[in-house]
Regions:
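Conserved N-terminal beta1-alpha1 strand-loop-helix module at the mouth
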Residues: 1-152
Length: 152
């Protein structure tokens, strides 16, 4: 399995002032939510207008298919698609594995071994894994119990 370093992503950006603060604090990635049901949703054209010269741009996608994701990525000037829903390996491959961040919730797995098997399954179909706390959703700032078991 590929090994990656940790990186910091500030997600839910909707304003230039928040993006500028994230860049100033050394974040590596900024996340834009493209799930219409989210209170932090941003239109792709609005995300494109935000200046992020010093930080890598990520779109968070929940239910969109590969074609919709690729269209939004182009419009919003995104480098990465964070797959936050029930996306398939085929969807990730169509987007391009080098552009995909796969979200996993360690607390959903019965063991660290089960989580590692899922990561191995996805390893060739994504550039990064994002290990989110809790068992669903995101952005709640809770530490996951399996992270220590993974040696993280």
């Amino acid at each position: 399995m590929k090994k990656h370093s940790f990186a910091i992503k500030v997600c839910g950006i909707t304003r230039q002032s928040d993006l500028s603060t994230a860049m100033g604090m050394g974040a590596h990635f900024c996340g834009f939510i493209f799930h219409p049901g989210s209170p932090r949703y941003i239109a792709p054209s609005r995300a494109a207008a935000l200046d992020s010269a010093l930080i890598r741009r990520v779109g968070v996608f929940v239910n969109q298919n590969a074609e919709e994701i690729m269209d939004i990525m182009k419009t919003a000037r995104l480098e990465f698609a964070q797959l936050h829903g029930a996306h398939s390996l085929d969807c990730a491959r169509r987007i391009g594995p080098e552009k995909v961040i796969r979200v996993l919730w360690p607390d959903r797995y019965e063991s660290v071994d089960a989580l590692q098997r899922e990561m191995e399954l996805w390893a060739d179909s994504c550039a990064w894994f994002l290990l989110d706390a809790g068992s669903q959703g995101g952005g709640h700032g809770v530490l996951g119990q399996h992270l220590a078991d993974l040696g993280l």
